[in-house]
Amino acid sequence: MQFMLMCRSLTYAQRTARVLERAGVTAGVARAPKSVSNRGCAYTVLVPERHGERALEILAGAGLSPERVLVKKPDGTITERDSGHDIS
């Protein structure tokens, strides 16, 4: 599984990924799937599940916060982190 940290812009996603990488957390930037984006162009920072909680703590400490936190399951379904409802 992966955490998908929704960001408001490509620049914000790149900054978020850079902060995580510097802290030793593997992170990649990708366009958000249309099924989870309520805007035309959104980006996500992808983080392995095992680093998800740590990534959120690092970002909070850096003053960065994702718009939404999603979890992409191995079967491809995407759920909101706290709600558990499928949104894909």
Which functions belong to the PLM regions below?
Residues 1-4, 8-11, 17, 21, ...:
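Amphipathic, hydrophobic secondary-structure cores in small proteins
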Residues 49-88:
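C-terminal structural segments of small proteins and small subunits
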